[in-house]
């Protein structure tokens, strides 16, 4: 599922796919179902999503992802 109905911001399919990919990659890294679920909670505005960015070595583009979270 690309779109989370709980998100109240702008619906932008490209941004959702990008944020969702982080959660998918993080799940593939750890293979724990709760990782994927927790990562998507609160429209990606949570500590698990931020930790996934770190774990996937995306720290140099964190601001880009954070601004995406703020849009959705």
From Swiss-Prot:
Report the locations given in the UniProt record.
Secreted
Organism name = Cherax destructor (Common yabby crayfish)
Reported function: Hormone found in the sinus gland of isopods and decapods which controls the blood sugar level. Has a secretagogue action over the amylase released from the midgut gland. May act as a stress hormone and may be involved in the control of molting and reproduction.
Question: What InterPro entries does its record include?
Answer: Crust_neurhormone_CS, Crust_neurohorm, Crust_neurohorm_sf, Hyperglycemic, Hyperglycemic1
Top-rank taxon: Eukaryota
Which Gene Ontology CC terms are recorded? extracellular region
Q: Which residues carry this modification: D-phenylalanine?
A: 3
Record family assignment:
Belongs to the arthropod CHH/MIH/GIH/VIH hormone family.
Q: List S-S links within the chain.
A: 7-43, 23-39, 26-52
Q: Name one GO biological process term.
A: glucose metabolic process
Modified residue annotations for Pyrrolidone carboxylic acid: 1
Main localization category: secreted
Name of protein = Crustacean hyperglycemic hormone B
Which keywords does this chain's UniProt record carry?
Amidation, Carbohydrate metabolism, D-amino acid, Disulfide bond, Glucose metabolism, Hormone, Neuropeptide, Pyrrolidone carboxylic acid, Secreted
Modification comment:
Stereoinversion of L-Phe (in CHHB-I) to D-Phe (in CHHB-II).
Under Gene Ontology molecular function, one entry of this record is: neuropeptide hormone activity
Question: One of this protein's Pfam families, by short name?
Answer: Crust_neurohorm
According to the UniProt record, list the residues that bear Valine amide.
72
């Amino acid at each position: 599922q690309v779109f989370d109905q709980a998100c109240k911001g702008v619906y932008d399919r490209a941004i959702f796919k990008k944020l969702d990919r982080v959660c998918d990659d993080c799940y593939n890294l750890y293979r724990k179902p709760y990782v994927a679920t927790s990562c998507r909670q609160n429209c990606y505005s949570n500590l698990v999503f931020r930790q996934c960015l770190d774990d996937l070595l995306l720290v140099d583009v964190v601001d880009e992802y954070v601004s995406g979270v703020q849009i959705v």
